[in-house]
């Protein structure tokens, strides 16, 4: 219990709800709209989300001072362990309130276990940062159609138009193989089109996916040789791509 966050006062409160309650869906929908990589769940996706859970799974929702749901924790308790299936929050008050709820169980548990995403600074937020963390592969992503992907990708706005000529390497999808000109307008709209000229800059479709999905930054990928490009190009990509770690708690 020394590692659990100390109770901190928040303006809202946490209440247990049924796992099929509308508050859970409402909270998640708001969360997904500002969280990079989160699945937009329809009824089928929610059914899949609960498919393999036991009847012991419970849910608790944090309500703000306006009685609006701002976060939730899905959990179960077994063998003196508080298992967290999922915890989401739309602001810091909700995060604090949910951890207050978890900490309130300290007298009946020996430890807390759960899953979160890479780079979540969980240890930093605890009273004692000496915790065991294990990184496990969970999902694999792939850009199937690069030109179509770029059309819908939300680049950062800028005061200048930007462009990058490069060779994209994809041994599987012919539509992604070849030289491209990527243009990014001032309002952040991207467009990729094929060009018939050799390019010094090179990147594989795997690295492109890693970069655009936010798993690794352009500067790091260039440092380890996964992107061949001039320093000013890497700086442009750093500025154009949002710095958000992807999060997904669904499995299908």
What are the residue ranges of the model-derived segments?
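Intrinsically disordered, low-complexity, positively biased terminal segments
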Residues: 4-252
């Amino acid at each position: 219990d020394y590692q659990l966050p100390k109770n901190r006062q928040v303006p809202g409160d946490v209440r247990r709800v049924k796992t099929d309650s509308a508050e859970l869906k409402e909270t998640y929908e708001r969360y997904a709209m500002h969280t990079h990589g989160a699945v937009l769940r329809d009824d089928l996706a929610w059914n899949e989300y609960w498919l393999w859970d036991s009847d012991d799974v419970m849910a608790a929702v944090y309500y703000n001072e306006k009685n609006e749901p701002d976060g939730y924790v899905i959990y179960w308790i077994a063998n003196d362990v508080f298992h967290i299936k999922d915890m989401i929050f739309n602001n810091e008050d909700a995060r604090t309130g949910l951890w207050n709820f978890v900490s309130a169980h300290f007298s009946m548990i020996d430890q807390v276990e759960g899953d979160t995403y890479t780079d979540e600074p969980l240890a930093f937020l605890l009273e004692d940062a000496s915790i065991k963390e294990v990184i496990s592969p969970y999902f694999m992503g792939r850009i199937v159609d690069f030109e179509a992907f770029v059309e819908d990708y939300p680049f950062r706005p800028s005061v200048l138009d930007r462009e990058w000529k490069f060779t994209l390497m994809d041994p599987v999808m012919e539509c992604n193989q070849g030289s491209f000109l990527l243009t990014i307008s001032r309002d952040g709209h991207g467009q990729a089109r094929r060009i018939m000229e050799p390019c010094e800059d090179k990147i594989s479709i795997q690295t492109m996916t890693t970069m655009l999905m936010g798993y690794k930054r352009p500067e790091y990928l260039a440092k380890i040789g996964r992107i061949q490009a001039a320093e000013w190009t890497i700086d442009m990509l750093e500025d154009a791509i949002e710095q958000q770690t992807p999060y997904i708690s669904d499995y299908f």
